[in-house]
């Protein structure tokens, strides 16, 4: 893609999300969401592959339906209450519609079916943008309409953690595994959002570098399926040694960074006297941990078949900067000692 066009699209992507962040009016927030959607569509279809075009079409139809529902719900709320302000108390019916529309935009279960299929048709870089940046604006909007319908939010959170764990079990495609991982992590954030929004934001902040690291590692290895990871030792031995730590951090295993938000969320849910919800979320994390372990095993403990006379793949020096990956990998693995300081900051 032309660098000038690419810079305009990325700028529009940032502008749309920033507009939604800064808006206190539902029409402006809707406009920001639409700018982001329209900016990412050319990035998704830039390779002109039938799968990419199919994924782009599915994404466009889903996002258009969600945007129409947001517009309808906000108009209905303005008609009932006479207010367009986001921070104004919403009527229960429009609030429920808005929650479902934002859940559809983010890919929360049970309206998640588009996300694995769309991610499967994209390259890893665009998939990374879809899994991280595109979640921010709907997430912030959901934070602002939170106090209205807690039972619907709890249902979305529990369903997402279960579906995110269950759906990834039988997958061999790495992009689908990462899609279900995204659904499960968003489920954890949504569960705690109604009780402690700072904790939900902390989970999102830690989720982003972990996902960034995982996507970048798979891109460096040119891997799209679990089976192709077997050649990782020959291509990038140092990166392959670090990868299990990042994957197990995504699974929430101590003493890695990913354990911190899960630990704090379970603590908060128990404080709020909903131990059953906390238990279901904790057990669903075991399902996710299994498929992260499977990917780690395929990458580090298996070697691709070759005879002794054959040469190993060339370890070509990458031309891209490895600094962002190094920083995100460090954050993904080593933030747990900061948990007491984080708890103190959250309780201010």
Curated annotation (Swiss-Prot):
Function field: Core subunit of the mitochondrial membrane respiratory chain NADH dehydrogenase (Complex I) that is believed to belong to the minimal assembly required for catalysis. Complex I functions in the transfer of electrons from NADH to the respiratory chain. The immediate electron acceptor for the enzyme is believed to be ubiquinone.
Catalytic activity: a ubiquinone + NADH + 5 H(+)(in) = a ubiquinol + NAD(+) + 4 H(+)(out)
Keyword Transport: yes
Swiss-Prot/TrEMBL keywords: Electron transport, Membrane, Mitochondrion, Mitochondrion inner membrane, NAD, Respiratory chain, Translocase, Transmembrane, Transmembrane helix, Transport, Ubiquinone
GO biological processes: mitochondrial electron transport, NADH to ubiquinone
Family of the protein in this entry: Belongs to the complex I subunit 2 family.
Positions of disulphide bridges: none
Gene: MT-ND2
Class in the EC hierarchy, top level: translocase
Domain of life: Eukaryota
Protein name: NADH-ubiquinone oxidoreductase chain 2
E.C. designation(s): 7.1.1.2
Membrane-spanning residues: 3-23, 24-44, 60-80, 95-115, 136-156, 177-197, 198-218, 239-259, 273-293, 325-345
């Amino acid at each position: 893609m032309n660098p000038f066009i690419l810079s305009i699209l990325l700028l529009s992507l940032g502008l749309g999300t920033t507009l939604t962040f800064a808006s206190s009016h539902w029409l402006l927030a809707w406009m920001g969401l639409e700018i982001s959607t329209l900016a990412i569509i050319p990035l998704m279809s830039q390779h002109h592959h039938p799968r990419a075009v199919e994924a782009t079409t599915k994404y466009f139809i889903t996002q258009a339906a969600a945007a129409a529902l947001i517009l309808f719900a906000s108009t209905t709320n303005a008609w009932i209450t006479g207010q367009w302000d986001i921070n104004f108390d919403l009527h229960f019916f429009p609030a429920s519609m808005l929650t479902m529309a934002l859940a559809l935009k983010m890919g929360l279960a049970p309206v998640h079916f588009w996300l694995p299929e769309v991610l499967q048709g994209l390259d890893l870089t665009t998939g990374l943008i879809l899994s991280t940046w595109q979640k921010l604006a709907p997430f912030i909007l959901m934070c602002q309409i939170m106090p209205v319908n807690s039972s619907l939010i709890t249902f979305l959170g529990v369903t997402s953690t279960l579906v995110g764990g269950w759906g990834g079990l039988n997958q061999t495609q790495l992009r689908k595994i990462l899609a279900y991982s995204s659904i499960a992590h968003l489920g954890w954030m949504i569960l705690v959002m109604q009780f402690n929004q700072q904790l939900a934001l902390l989970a999102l902040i830690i989720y982003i570098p972990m996902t960034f690291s995982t996507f970048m590692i798979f891109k460096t290895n040119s891997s799209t399926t679990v089976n192709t990871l077997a050649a990782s030792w020959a291509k990038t031995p140092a990166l392959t040694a670090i990868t299990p730590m990042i994957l197990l951090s995504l699974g929430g295993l101590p003493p890695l960074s990913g354990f911190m938000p899960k630990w704090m969320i379970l603590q908060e849910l128990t404080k709020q006297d909903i131990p059953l919800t906390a238990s279901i979320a904790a057990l669903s994390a075991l399902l996710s941990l299994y498929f992260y372990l499977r990917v780690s095993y395929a990458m580090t403990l298996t070697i691709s078949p070759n005879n002794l006379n054959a040469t190993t793949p060339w370890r070509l020096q990458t031309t891209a900067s490895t600094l962002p990956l190094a920083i995100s990998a460090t954050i993904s693995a080593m933030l747990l000692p900061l948990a007491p300081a984080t708890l103190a900051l959250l309780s201010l």
